[in-house]
């Protein structure tokens, strides 16, 4: 293939296309003569919309088709929302670049209420994320939590049609789509701990493709990469997938990395939390150590019950 072309595999949703175009613009900023093509495709997670994500099961619902395009040489890189990226990669592929993180928080979206606290008893809140569900139920057991699938526009339409009193989405996704005005309030990490890698864009490529790796190098954001490394290291040790009730969020304070995490029962009845601080150079070790702490507190029993529920449904 020509040396001045790079092809980006991406999902077809508006948000995924925004992320791919963002990477396209970054590449063109550093390499004005580079021809960057988008290769949109549909993933299994995009097709199965009538089933809660947790029940669809399996890892990599939104990335497998993109990875196949890389392996078959139909694309050179794949752009992912980091919270959708599994902890394991096919042989020959890997995550080489993490772009600068956007706002990692969850957004409270409603047409009638300004905050979670304002919701009356029995209000219906939409989210398919087990992580969001367990934290909502622990905080507000009086609410009715219902699954909500589809792209951002579809979810907002369901809210506007009166199917829900409020929905929970990612702040970053709404901002990227120019829908920031729909955010009634952003939920702090204390209210809703984000997903692993939430708000960050990751780039996957063939590990033996030195040309592509060299082109991607300027797009890597060192601080974001360290934070996401800690969060993902914790997730790897917990053997967590994308559709599990795990929250993890790392912050940097100078050279110190502060990692918080939780594993919760989907019904909100049990919440195991922990935090660790250490040198940013030990990001991966901090993630593993925090996972060990959560496992010692009983996280494995919660996760096992979740996986059994997914396999039997």
Curated annotation (Swiss-Prot):
Catalytic activity: 4 porphobilinogen + H2O = hydroxymethylbilane + 4 NH4(+)
Example GO BP: protoporphyrinogen IX biosynthetic process
This protein's GO CC annotations: cytoplasm
Transmembrane segments: none
Keyword list, A-Z: Porphyrin biosynthesis, Transferase
Pfam family, one: Porphobil_deam
Pathway terms, separated by semicolons: Porphyrin-containing compound metabolism; protoporphyrin-IX biosynthesis; coproporphyrinogen-III from 5-aminolevulinate: step 2/4
KW tRNA processing (keyword) present: no
The EC number(s) this enzyme carries: 2.5.1.61
Alphabetized InterPro entries for the sequence: HemC, Porphobilin_deaminase_cofac_BS, Porphobilin_deaminase_N, Porphobilinogen_deaminase_C, Porphobilinogen_deaminase_C_sf
Cofactor entry: dipyrromethane
Cofactor note (record): Binds 1 dipyrromethane group covalently.
PTM-bearing positions, type S-(dipyrrolylmethanemethyl)cysteine: 242
Other information: The porphobilinogen subunits are added to the dipyrromethane group.
Role noted for this protein: Tetrapolymerization of the monopyrrole PBG into the hydroxymethylbilane pre-uroporphyrinogen in several discrete steps.
HAMAP family cross-referenced by the UniProt entry: Porphobil_deam
Official protein name in the record: Porphobilinogen deaminase
Species in which this protein is naturally found: Pectobacterium atrosepticum (strain SCRI 1043 / ATCC BAA-672) (Erwinia carotovora subsp. atroseptica)
């Amino acid at each position: 293939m020509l040396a001045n072309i790079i092809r980006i595999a991406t999902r077809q949703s508006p948000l995924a296309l925004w992320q791919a175009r963002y990477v396209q613009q970054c590449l063109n900023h550093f390499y004005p003569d580079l021809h960057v093509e988008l290769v949109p495709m549909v993933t299994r997670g995009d097709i199965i919309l009538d089933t809660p994500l947790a029940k669809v099961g399996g890892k990599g619902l939104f990335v497998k088709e993109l990875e196949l395009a890389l392996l078959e040489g139909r694309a050179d890189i794949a752009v992912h929302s980091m919270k959708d990226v599994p902890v394991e990669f096919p042989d020959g592929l890997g995550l080489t670049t993490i772009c600068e993180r956007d706002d990692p928080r969850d957004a409270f979206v409603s047409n009638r209420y300004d905050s979670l606290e304002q919701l009356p008893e029995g209000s219906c809140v939409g989210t398919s994320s087990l992580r969001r569900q367990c934290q909502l139920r622990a905080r507000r057991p009086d609410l009715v939590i219902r699954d909500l699938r589809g792209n951002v526009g579809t979810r907002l339409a369901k809210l506007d049609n009166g199917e829900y009193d409020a929905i929970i989405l990612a702040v970053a996704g709404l901002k990227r789509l120019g829908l920031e005005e729909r955010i009634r309030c952003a939920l702090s990490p204390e209210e809703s701990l984000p997903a692993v890698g939430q708000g960050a864009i990751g780039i996957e490529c063939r590990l033996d493709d030195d040309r592509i790796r060299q082109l991607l190098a300027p797009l890597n954001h060192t601080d974001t990469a360290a934070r996401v490394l800690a969060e993902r290291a914790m997730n790897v040790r917990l053997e967590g997938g994308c559709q599990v009730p795990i929250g993890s969020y790392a912050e940097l304070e100078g050279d110190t990395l502060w990692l918080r995490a939780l594993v919760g029962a989907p019904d909100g009845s049990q919440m195991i939390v922990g935090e660790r601080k250490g040198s940013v150079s030990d990001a991966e070790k901090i993630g593993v150590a925090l996972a060990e702490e959560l496992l010692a507190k009983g996280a494995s029993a919660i996760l096992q019950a979740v996986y059994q529920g997914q396999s039997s449904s």
